[in-house]
Amino acid sequence: GQGIISIAATIGMASLKNNLFFKQAEVHGMSQRGGAVQSHFRLSDKEIASDLIPMGAADIILSVEPMESLRYLPFLSETGWLVTNTRPFVNIPNYPELAEIIKEIEKHPNHIALDADQIAQEIGAARSSNIVMLGAASPFIQIPFECLEDGIRKIFGAKGEDVVNANLKALHAGKQFSDSKK
């Protein structure tokens, strides 16, 4: 629903172009009923044995929902980057105050927090907030940006040129946001 699988597929496509090894695992936590979808994505220039990321070993947590970003923080390495959307997906009673969640996110020294939904709407690509998030994470992914663009073209190509262009625009908008914050 929120595009985590499309993000992972795009990175996977981009990593193939760079002759990198990758393994991906998805966990669908009752996603049909509003639960979280989590995707572990490991990328390396060497062979990878396991598709799951050990606690404290992730270089990036890319989250399309702010509270979910905090849930997976134990996976992040000390030097890793937390890249998260600030627009909540309120699907539970007693959702915590957004200001408190943002305060917790800001405690992490390496973080990028953006309202990807608003950015996607502003650029006329309202359904591409997930790709705005991928663009925001792109400076921290060890793959050339052009390869992510090619991944977008391959993943969304069958949906037509308008969809591809909207997602490319979203990718660029997210990268531009992160570049302005570094």
Predicted stretch roles:
Residues G1-K182:
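Active-site cofactor/cluster-binding pocket
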